A protein has these predicted regions:
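C-terminal, active-site-flanking charged/polar segments
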Residues: 149-150, 169-184, 200-204
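Active-site rim recognition segments
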Residues: 20, 184-209
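Short, basic, helix/turn surface patches
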Residues: 105-110, 176-193
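Cleft-lining beta-strand/loop regions that shape enzyme active-site pockets
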Residues: 1-174, 210-218, 224-229
Length: 231
């Protein structure tokens, strides 16, 4: 390898494991989407993506809740391409907390609810993005946001793969998965979440050529919906 001046130079290339490469690509994409949201909305909207509904992503969500939401009026929460897990109710506990009292400390300063809540909270408007690659607990989260009227959903109908399963080992060493609990929406019809994906309030499809052009039509719509919620 030569330098711009034409002199030879030595370059050391360290290969990355596939997992580290995927993680880096994920972080880069989330950063670009966050920058797009903040730039397009002139700082009014925040953005964060939940990669999975498990403990690492839950802790990351709480951490990013402060960074993404600081000074913002509306938060875009993205569960597209989220394979699921089990943390919906913990995420909801950060998004649906109401103050039941107020305090007046001696000498002024902060009071309730500081130090009283398990998780950080966000009580301003939210817009949730979901798509056909949102599975299982990510679908339960989407249904919960819709059923509890916490905010509008944007994107595509979720996959419709919601059921609790366990497993049993066989004599040959293989494992068989077994369903043991069905999930139903707490609505008038008691909709079975299995085979019934959560329909968004604003259906938007990203076209095949959009990725090459770095265009995200679903995010564009979510930004417009979010701006309409700014007071």
């Amino acid at each position: 390898v030569t330098s711009p001046a034409g002199e030879p130079r030595e370059v050391l290339i360290r290969p990355s494991a596939s997992g580290a490469l995927r993680s880096g690509m994920y972080d880069r994409r989330e950063r670009l989407l966050r920058e797009q949201v903040e730039s397009t909305s002139e700082g009014k909207l925040g953005y964060l993506h939940i990669q999975a509904m498990g403990t690492p992503s839950l802790l990351e969500f709480e951490r990013k809740l402060y960074a993404a939401g600081h000074g913002k009026d509306v938060l875009l929460i993205d569960v597209r391409d989220n394979g699921g897990g089990w943390t919906t109710d913990m995420v909801l506990s950060m998004l649906m907390v109401e103050d039941h009292a107020f305090t007046i400390p001696r000498g002024g300063g902060t009071g309730y609810p500081q130090g009283r809540r398990i998780f950080g909270t966000w009580d301003k408007p939210v817009v949730v993005l979901c798509n056909e690659n949102s599975y299982s607990n990510a679908e339960i989260f989407s249904w919960a946001i819709k059923t509890l009227k916490r905010g509008p959903l944007v994107g595509k109908k979720t996959f419709g793969a919601v059921i609790s399963t366990g497993g049993a080992g066989l004599l040959d060493g293989s494992l068989i998965r077994m369903p043991f609990r069905g999930w139903y929406v707490n609505n008038r019809d008691g909709t079975n979440m299995e085979l019934n994906g959560c329909p968004p309030d604003h259906a938007v499809e990203n076209l095949p050529g959009d990725y090459v052009l770095s265009r995200d039509r679903q995010l564009e719509k979510a930004i417009n919906v979010g701006l309409s919620l700014v007071e």
